[in-house]
Swiss-Prot record:
Keyword hit for Cytoplasm: yes
GO molecular function: peptidyl-tRNA hydrolase activity; tRNA binding
Reaction(s) this enzyme catalyzes, per UniProt: an N-acyl-L-alpha-aminoacyl-tRNA + H2O = an N-acyl-L-amino acid + a tRNA + H(+)
Known EC number: 3.1.1.29
GO BP, sorted A to Z: protein quality control for misfolded or incompletely synthesized proteins; rescue of stalled ribosome
Residue sites binding tRNA per the record: 14, 64, 66, 112
Residues carrying the site annotation Stabilizes the basic form of H active site to accept a proton: 91
Native source species: Roseobacter denitrificans (strain ATCC 33942 / OCh 114)
UniProt protein name: Peptidyl-tRNA hydrolase
Amino acid sequence: MKLIVGLGNPGPKYAGHRHNIGFMALDRIAADHGFGAWKDKHQGSLSEGRFGSDRAVLLKPLTFMNNSGQSVQAAMRFYKLEPEDVIVLHDEIDLAPGKVKYKTGGGHAGHNGLRSIHAHIGPEYARVRLGVGHPGHKDRVPGYVLHDFAKADQDWLDDVLRGVSDGAPFLATTEAAKFSNAVALRVSPRRSGTGQKGKDKPPAPAKQQATATKAEPEPDTRSALQKLMERFK
């Protein structure tokens, strides 16, 4: 069984924030795959269900982002799970909008939700990094992630959420490559940092080969004496 965790902050005022893309992803998964009603358990909101024969639990910690690890640890203890059974979906400012990356282990890169999970269960869990882009300067990061997605983001955001939902059965079976492929089928290439679909550049036209050839000089049939006489004319 897998515990799939989406990170965010509870409450309507935070629902549309970039920081809450993990919550959004879990809501889409639960709706698309017929998971059970959300129930408040283990300091979070929890929904149980199956992807085929594979059982999974979806968890949205209600502890606020900075204490997400408390809820994750409580759910792990109840279901008797190991860190290797946990997959965390979270916002990632170091990825362009619309980019999705799967990884296992590693640092928290300053993400407070991951920092809390590290402190409670260690780093050996899987993550799905959901790119939201970077505001350009580190001082602007808090205001950026704690702000609603722009209207211009809605198209790529919907593609990402659909793609993650399409790939969710492969999260349950730890098939990272198949998960990534499912996402890629939904998410088309985008211009870095804009969240807009990029247009393929037309191939550069092939250089035309010159068809004209240089004229060959005619052979000089004069004798040496004739050439000498020509010089003194």
